[in-house]
Amino acid sequence: MINVSLKRSLLIFISVITSNIGSEARELTGAGKKLEVATRSSNYAGTARTLLQARPCQRDVDCNFQCPRIQGGQCNNHHGTCDCF
């Protein structure tokens, strides 16, 4: 009986710790705020998609993460988008 209560308390402790780590990570990245702004009103139905999209590029290096690795891409500075090869 003692073994079962110990396992239960350990499981609760681990779940609390991991949930706190997840909430801190969301605060650091700002993901919670982006979703909160997008879901605040029905007038902003398409806002969640645009807020969570990748940031516009500023250099060609930024396009390496958005384009396939082998082909790569080039940053279109005028539009702030990546043109993949």
From Swiss-Prot:
* Keywords for the protein's UniProt record, in alphabetical order: Antimicrobial, Disulfide bond, Fungicide, Plant defense, Secreted, Signal
Q: Which domain of life is it from?
A: Eukaryota
What is the annotated signal peptide range for this record?
Answer: 1-25
**Primary location group:** secreted
* Keyword set includes Cytoplasm: no
User: Where does the record say this protein resides?
Assistant: Secreted
Please give the biological process terms from Gene Ontology that the record holds: defense response to fungus; killing of cells of another organism
Q: Which cysteines are joined by disulfide bonds?
A: C57-C75, C63-C82, C67-C84
An example Gene Ontology cellular component term from the record?
A: extracellular region
Which family is it part of?
Belongs to the DEFL family.
* Name of the protein this chain belongs to: Putative defensin-like protein 258
